[in-house]
């Protein structure tokens, strides 16, 4: 007899920042329980699908009881008796029929909330894998039509700035990528060792409290300027003995410091500053070019504001061969925005965040489009995470080639990296690590 859904329940749990988030349980007719929880971001793109929050004074307005109620009273009852392997049909049913809200960029989930729909979509995917009797990553690969499983290069966010940290640093993340490793296991070793060397370098230079960690496990020393962050990474990589094997990535999150006067304020964290560090998009582009010529930078994410298509296109055409230009706030994992960016040659890599778009099916579509355009793809956590490890399987199943889920520190970050270690072990001799081919690890599917 076919295995079907017998119940769908959601509850409010807490993310790694102590904010409420949604968790969903799907019970199947064979007694199996599939559970998934959704994350939430600090620097969010204005084009992301709606994350439904309660407002009011409870939990400082961040409660999710409405989203939970939407799962329990609207989504859940509508899925009873359905086949959990029908991911695409059920995602489309939730998004287009049960919710049905649309804006210029497509299905915006304004009625039920992307957090409500996604919790169920992720749990459905886990339930579907169970019914098929295969690991989650294989089920995801099958849903996408991908034949090649690949372990991603981890991009460890080891120095935090921007909206994630209380220092003066404008740029949000400085990452290390062990592209020279021969396996994911070795990449973890390299990443952890560089992280510990970085800790001692920072402690020596800035003092003990500079090694306190931020939301994603990285350090937030009192760095005065962005170049200093790059210099610290270069030193730590050298001390660990991995020069040439471990390279650098940045997430600038430039929308956070773009002003109405169309300038970028590199001193945005100092209130009422004199404006002396405001620069034009053109000047910022040249700053990135100078960074890329001085340091082993392979990836720059969100280098400009989410509506500054012009400078995105310029930077991509000028250094896009050598450095991948990643769209996060620009694209918000939205197939329609990906399409526009492909046409305008605005960037050449997608940051994949399932909770920006709100369903597994739409996420897969954004990835397939990106791959067909010859782009790179980086799977990503959010700054407010849970112990859920779905994105580890997603990254392998879609052969993204890259994943960023924080520093090798804090359990909600390690949960994903540890799951990738398990997957690599399970694949045994068939395991392939993306390594130097992290931008195009497989043929488009």
From Swiss-Prot:
Cofactor binding notes: Mg(2+) is required for catalysis and for stabilizing the dimer.
Keyword Transcription on entry: no
Superkingdom per UniProt: Eukaryota
Binding site for substrate: 164, 173, 301, 328, 380-383, 404
Swiss-Prot/TrEMBL keywords: Cytoplasm, Glycolysis, Lyase, Magnesium, Metal-binding
EC number(s) from the headed UniProt entry: 4.2.1.11
Disulphide connectivity of cysteines: none
GO molecular function terms attached to this record: magnesium ion binding; phosphopyruvate hydratase activity
GO cellular component, one term: phosphopyruvate hydratase complex
Catalytic activity: (2R)-2-phosphoglycerate = phosphoenolpyruvate + H2O
Active site positions, chain numbering: 216, 353
SMART domains: Enolase_C, Enolase_N
Alphabetical list of InterPro entries matching this protein: Enolase, Enolase-like_C_sf, Enolase-like_N, Enolase_C, Enolase_CS, Enolase_N
Binding annotation for Mg(2+): 251, 301, 328
Pathway(s) of this molecule: Carbohydrate degradation; glycolysis; pyruvate from D-glyceraldehyde 3-phosphate: step 4/5
Broad class of enzyme this protein falls into: lyase
Similarity comment: family membership: Belongs to the enolase family.
Name used for this protein in its record: Enolase
The organism of origin for this protein: Ricinus communis (Castor bean)
């Amino acid at each position: 007899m076919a295995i079907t859904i017998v119940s769908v329940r959601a509850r409010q749990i807490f993310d790694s920042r102590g904010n409420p988030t949604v968790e969903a349980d799907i019970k199947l007719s064979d007694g199996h329980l599939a559970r998934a929880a959704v994350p939430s971001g600090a620097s969010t793109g204005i084009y992301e699908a709606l994350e439904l929050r309660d407002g009011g004074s409870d939990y400082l307005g961040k409660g999710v009881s409405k989203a939970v109620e939407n799962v329990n009273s609207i989504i859940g009852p509508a899925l009873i008796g359905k086949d959990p392997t029908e991911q695409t049909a059920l995602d489309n049913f939730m998004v287009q029929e049960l919710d049905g809200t649309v804006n210029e960029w497509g299905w915006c989930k304004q009625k039920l909330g992307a957090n409500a729909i996604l919790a169920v979509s992720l749990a459905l995917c886990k339930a579907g894998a169970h019914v098929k009797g295969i690991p989650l990553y294989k089920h995801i690969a099958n849903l996408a039509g991908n034949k090649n499983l690949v372990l991603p290069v981890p991009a460890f966010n080891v120095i935090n700035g921007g909206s994630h940290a209380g220092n003066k640093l404008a740029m949000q993340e400085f990452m290390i990528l062990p592209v020279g490793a021969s396996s994911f296991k070795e990449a973890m070793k390299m990443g952890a060792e560089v992280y510990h060397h970085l800790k001692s370098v920072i402690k020596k230079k800035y003092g003990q409290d500079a090694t306190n960690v931020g939301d994603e496990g990285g350090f937030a020393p009192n760095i005065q300027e962005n170049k200093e962050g790059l210099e610290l990474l270069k030193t730590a990589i050298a001390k660990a003995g991995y020069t040439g094997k471990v390279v650098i990535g940045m997430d600038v999150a430039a929308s956070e410091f773009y002003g109405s006067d169309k300038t970028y304020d590199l001193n945005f964290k100092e209130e009422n500053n004199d404006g002396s560090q405001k620069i034009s998009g053109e000047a910022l582009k040249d700053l990135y070019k100078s960074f890329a010529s001085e340091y082993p930078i392979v990836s720059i994410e969100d280098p400009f504001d989410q509506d500054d298509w012009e400078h995105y296109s310029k930077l991509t055409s000028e250094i896009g061969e050598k450095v991948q230009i990643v769209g996060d706030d620009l694209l918000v994992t939205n197939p329609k925005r990906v399409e526009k960016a492909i046409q305008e040659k605005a960037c050449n890599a997608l940051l994949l965040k399932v909770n920006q778009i709100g369903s597994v099916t739409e996420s897969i579509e954004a990835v397939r489009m990106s791959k067909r355009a010859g782009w790179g793809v980086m799977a990503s956590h959010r700054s407010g995470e849970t112990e859920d490890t779905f994105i580890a399987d997603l990254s392998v199943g879609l052969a993204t080639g890259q994943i960023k889920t924080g520093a090798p520190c804090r359990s909600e970050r390690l949960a994903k990296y540890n799951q990738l270690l398990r997957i690599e072990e399970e694949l045994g001799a068939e395991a392939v690590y993306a390594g130097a081919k992290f931008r195009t690890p497989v043929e488009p599917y």
